[in-house]
């Protein structure tokens, strides 16, 4: 008896021979329609390939992600601001790109992590110029061109990633054209030398109201260092309304008007955010019962505010499958990560203790205050993309908020009746 697979292949072959069936269009990755492009690593190798994105030259920090899926989420993640992102997955673009403007029931972007592409360029081994997925509205090539993102395909990404792994994250540039002099004296721009958070934060406070059917009467202040949409979604879907502030807003002056403080992810060197660090110091000192939760850059800023130090990793951790151990329970979780800096756990003060540790490189992945309801993680519990193993940390934050509200007998006015909320816009201010 023929197996199901053999029967399918036999039927498909017969149908193809008689041309009596319609088949989906094959993925065509021909480079005949593409112009030449070059990726140059500063003081390193040069890779020739083909341009399938915007016709512009770009430079920035070259980094890589080993994530198998989620390229729309990665490319719109503000933590990738100013970077040239290399995908180790050989074929990228085969399921296209979904709508960049579609919203969910919370008025948050449904598929993207921010309103626009944040990385300045992408590098792939094989770009799928055709796509197939029910949510897709355009190809990766069309999206890159429309968004002004340089994109190069036909690159030996294994060689590139091996170099970055051994030498560390390096500056790179993508140039478009038939001929390019690799020795040309052109600047390699270092995004790490500037305050990237200032470029991705909201320019003014705005409010996200929790729909009545979800609301639990909780009001959280969010410091937007480049917050991913799914982080905001994880807070709202648990019953909180959010007031989102620019990263350097003097939140310490109004912290007592909120049930909790959240510090988001974001790009670049945390030491550039000294104003935020000083504001957090005041909150930790003057509002000792107030629940605080930080993710990624938010974790690093809390660490700096507590007196600890941060370090730049050799090539960073950017993947959807990194194991991190909970040092309190001993449980191991698979986490989604995207960062080039980390907290030096050896510099934590006596009031803090490590919460999670990366089992690949033993870098710090979280910390928790011994006496106050404050904790933070280097990894992304909201995922998108990635596993949901650590989504319980949002529940932990809300548990802390409920204890805080109950123990302090808080009876704040309804969130939506606040004068502050009434005058704020309802979406991010670019």
UniProtKB/Swiss-Prot annotation:
Annotated transit peptide: 1-9
Localization (cell): Mitochondrion matrix
Keywords in alphabetical order: Amino-acid biosynthesis, Arginine biosynthesis, ATP-binding, Glutamine amidotransferase, Ligase, Mitochondrion, Nucleotide-binding, Transit peptide
Domain of life from the UniProt record: Eukaryota
Chain segments annotated as transmembrane: none
Residues covered by the Glutamine amidotransferase type-1 domain: 219-407
Pathway the protein takes part in: Amino-acid biosynthesis; L-arginine biosynthesis; carbamoyl phosphate from bicarbonate: step 1/1
Disulfide bonds: none
SMART domains registered for this protein in UniProt: CPSase_sm_chain (SM01097)
Reactions catalysed: hydrogencarbonate + L-glutamine + 2 ATP + H2O = carbamoyl phosphate + L-glutamate + 2 ADP + phosphate + 2 H(+)
SUPFAM superfamilies with a match to the protein in the record: Carbamoyl phosphate synthetase, small subunit N-terminal domain (SSF52021), Class I glutamine amidotransferase-like (SSF52317)
One CC-aspect GO term: carbamoyl-phosphate synthase complex
Enzyme class: ligase
InterPro entries linked to this entry: Anth_synth/Amidotransfase, CarbamoylP_synth_ssu, CarbamoylP_synth_ssu_N, CarbP_synth_ssu_N_sf, Class_I_gatase-like, CPSase_GATase1, GATASE
The EC number(s) this enzyme carries: 6.3.5.5
One of the Pfam families matching this protein, by short name: GATase
Active site: 296, 380, 382
Known role: Small subunit of the arginine-specific carbamoyl phosphate synthase (CPSase). CPSase catalyzes the formation of carbamoyl phosphate from the ammonia moiety of glutamine, carbonate, and phosphate donated by ATP, the first step of the arginine biosynthetic pathway. The small subunit (glutamine amidotransferase) binds and cleaves glutamine to supply the large subunit with the substrate ammonia.
Subunit structure: Heterodimer composed of 2 chains; the small (or glutamine) chain promotes the hydrolysis of glutamine to ammonia, which is used by the large (or ammonia) chain to synthesize carbamoyl phosphate.
Family of the protein in this entry: Belongs to the CarA family.
Protein name: Carbamoyl phosphate synthase arginine-specific small chain
UniProt gene name: CPA1
